[in-house]
Amino acid sequence: MRLAVVGATGAVGTEMLAILEGRDLHIDELRPVASARSAGRKLTFRDSIVEAVGIGPTAFEGIDIALFDVPDDASAEWAPVAAESGAVVVDNSAAWRMHEQVPLVVPEINPTDVDHRPLGIVASPNCTMLALVVPLGALHKRAGLKRVIASSYQAASGAGRPGVDELWDQLERAAKDPEPVTRGLAREVLEPGTTFPHPLALNVIPQVGSVRDDGYTGEESKVAAEARKVLGMADLPVTTTCVRVPTVVGHGVSVHAEFEEPIDAAEARTLLGAAPGIEVLDDPGRGLYPTPLEAAGRDPCYVGRIRQDPYDPRALEWFCVADNLRKGAALNTIQIAELIVERGSGSRTGA
């Protein structure tokens, strides 16, 4: 198979290459595709040196599958070009996720959707939604989802390298002048950067994305809409509050889920423990529960603090964490490509 990684020099593109190193996916040719600024950059892949080519009409010639991690506008422009060249596009941007002719796929939940791609494009969901939906899907099969209320705790890397750089810069400034910080006056030494609306160091910011007229942010609306699409439940009530926190990698989500049928915490632990892509860490008395540090650099969605709602036998609470650069982006995109190959649906449209 001839595989292109578009956006290969970015944070997620770099993670894609690292993950592909250890996967069993047979690759005859790996073609890194990057912006004109990064074209010509040499990368190492499976003991070989590969050179990034600039994105353009000829970049996709002979490619079977193209993994995209580029800004929305770049994906909107170049994903159709890659598809018209004969490649199956697996896209990690928001450009195609809600397009009615583009499947939005989480392999653990809706693998057969990958077969129906009339535009030759398959979308991979938002990183926060992925952490949320993997356990939801596992429990929905047993008890039937009725409603979801979730709050996210999103790492700086969700805003890309600029977000991480801004956080480190602010932490360094706070460390150099700790006196006002210890007196609760961190705002005297920290100023907002260009990535987040307030200083992120020593802080949490209850805004991820622009605020809409209804008071919800774009991120909150995306998470809800994408969860409905992946689960195939267009009318499922999903309410989210998305918060940026001063961690580097790993998005956490606190979840309240209501079901059609009664389900208790013990059964939920058993179901989640047997579900693909999930690892249960749930012994809070011994300090065993998911944290971003636990999830960083690892593939599973970690789930813990699983509790029965004391007022409703049909409701559960839990906390889950996934590495937003791996399962939240690069890994899910690669898993979709593996699914396409596995199902033998490698033609552009899957027909």
Question: Where do the protein language model's features map onto the residues?
Answer:
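C-terminal active-site/capping subdomain that shapes the small-molecule cofactor and substrate pocket
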Residues: 235-351
